[in-house]
């Protein structure tokens, strides 16, 4: 009997790996290659390739996928010169390819220069793959070095302009572009190289490298200045924008794109025939509904992605996680198997000492997940929290939904309990989890400020707790309304949208 169970389990595992699903999809600016497409795409190509070899069943790869997707989005304009690529080594048909490239751990990232001819041309990336800005600069350095070494036909784009060259002469090489960017830096000129690659195929702007002592730079900045960027509009002799000291290349890129929208070669046409403004979105009641699918996706992402992002959890972080798991096990809504999963994980984490290896966490979580029939999904899916774009709403919406659902569940369970302490039982555990484990660092810091500003620690009753979450949520929505994180299809609104909707929405939410 025991052998039969082992064989059944082994077959299930083999089937799972043979039919491995990708961590990436068509919406990502990433090319997924396989054994039968890798050589044709990478070898003897005009483009360089930056390749992540990953396993779709590897916890580290699952946690890293959002980072690599974000990195690929940033490098989307670089695709004429370098392509971000992935290979799923968990897929049986790709195992020979991964062995050929000596991929022994996941994720492994390699740079293949343009014109590569074999596996030996792959350079393993040894930098910090979690530091996106630095990885982008490292790719620029790889490309610059390979162009220089191979005397590539485009190697000249990285050459600094001669110190004798005037601003007018720089414009002469700008073609029909209305904007000229001068990036000032000594070697290694990582910021200029990245910007030159980024805008290489953009007809709106020409970016050139100049040394800090170039007369045009000195005149504009009144001194030699390393690591600065000057943006000129055609016809002007003074820059319309100068980067602050220490600006990252991507911040400069975003600023240049803002000016392209105003002064680019297509800007006049858009002014002559302006597009009709997008219609004001009416209140869509579904955006205020609580959907079990959203809650399950949020809990899945929280447990499987957010918590295991670090190798170890210890000290105050572990205390905070224990408190949050206790809150979840008591008040998180969901199916009976989900509540059992949270209860068992809470029992397990409280049995630990002062340090938790997140590999142990993931293993235990997977063990409990399987034993309960996989009550949580293996990927996120959004209904009420779906955004018009993949990067909008989703998990952050799900977090707010979970907070509201837990606060309402706690209210219903404890409203007549005079001993109930909403701060200790619900609010502070949620606050500390967000502050310590939310992968959006800036979001975590902002919520920490909101908790202090709105006096979280002074909440006394279950009713005040429910209202506190809505008050803070409304405040955050007001602050972020119209920002880049606002979804035009589901604008950030105050809750409830009108007094007449209160009863309807409460019925939906509870």
Ranges and model annotations:
Residues 2-48, 78, 82, 87-92, ...:
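N-terminal leader/targeting and pre-domain segments
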Residues 405-510:
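Alpha-helical bundle/repeat cores within regulatory domains of eukaryotic proteins
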Residues 49-50, 68, 104-124, 216-254, ...:
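A short, hydrophobic beta-strand/beta-hairpin element that forms part of a small beta-sheet core
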């Amino acid at each position: 009997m025991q052998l039969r169970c082992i064989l059944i389990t082994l077959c299930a595992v083999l089937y799972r790996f043979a039919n491995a699903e990708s961590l990436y999809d068509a919406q990502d600016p990433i090319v997924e290659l396989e054994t039968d497409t890798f050589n044709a795409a990478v070898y003897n190509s005009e483009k360089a390739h930056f390749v992540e070899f990953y396993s779709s069943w590897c916890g580290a790869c699952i946690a890293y996928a959002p980072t690599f997707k974000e990195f690929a989005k940033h490098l989307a304009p670089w695709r004429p010169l370098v392509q971000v690529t992935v290979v799923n080594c968990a897929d049986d048909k790709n195992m020979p390819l991964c062995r050929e490239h000596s991929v022994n751990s996941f994720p492994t990232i390699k740079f293949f220069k343009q014109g590569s001819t074999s596996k030996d041309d792959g350079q393993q990336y040894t930098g910090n793959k979690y530091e996106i800005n630095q990885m982008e600069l490292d790719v620029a350095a790889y490309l610059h070095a390979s162009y220089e070494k191979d005397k590539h036909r485009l190697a000249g784009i990285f050459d600094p302009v001669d110190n004798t060259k005037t601003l007018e002469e720089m414009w002469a090489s700008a073609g029909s572009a209305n904007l000229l960017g001068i990036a000032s830096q000594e070697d290694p000129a990582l910021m200029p190289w990245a910007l030159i690659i980024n805008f290489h195929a953009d007809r709106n702007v020409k970016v050139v490298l100049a040394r800090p002592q170039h007369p045009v730079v000195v005149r504009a900045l009144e001194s030699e200045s390393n690591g600065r960027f000057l943006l000129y509009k055609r016809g002007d002799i003074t820059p319309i924008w100068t980067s602050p000291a220490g600006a990252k290349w991507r911040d400069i890129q975003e600023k240049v794109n803002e000016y392209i929208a105003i002064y680019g070669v297509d800007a006049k046409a858009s002014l002559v025939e302006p597009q009709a403004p997008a219609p004001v979105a009416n209140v869509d009641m579904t955006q205020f509904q609580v959907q079990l699918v959203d809650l399950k996706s949020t809990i899945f992402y929280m447990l499987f992605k957010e918590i295991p992002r670090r190798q170890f959890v210890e000290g105050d972080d572990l205390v905070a996680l224990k408190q949050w798991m206790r809150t979840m096990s008591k008040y998180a809504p969901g199916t009976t198997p989900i509540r059992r999963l949270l209860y068992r994980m809470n029992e397990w984490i409280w049995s630990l000492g002062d340090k938790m290896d997140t590999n142990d966490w993931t293993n235990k979580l997977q063990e409990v997940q399987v034993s309960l029939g996989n009550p949580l999904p293996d990927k996120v899916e959004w209904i009420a929290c779906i955004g018009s774009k993949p990067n909008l709403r989703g998990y952050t919406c799900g977090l707010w939904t979970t907070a509201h659902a837990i606060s309402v569940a706690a209210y219903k369970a404890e409203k007549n309990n005079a001993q109930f302490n909403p701060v200790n039982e619900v609010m502070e555990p949620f606050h500390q989890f967000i502050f310590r484990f939310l992968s959006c660092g800036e979001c975590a810091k902002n919520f920490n400020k909101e908790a202090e500003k709105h006096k979280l620690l002074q909440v006394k009753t279950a009713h005040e707790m429910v209202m506190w979450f809505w008050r803070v949520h409304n405040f955050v929505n007001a602050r972020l309304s119209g920002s880049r994180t606002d979804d035009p299809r589901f604008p950030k609104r105050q809750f409830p949208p009108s007094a007449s909707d209160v009863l309807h929405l409460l019925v939906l939410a509870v």
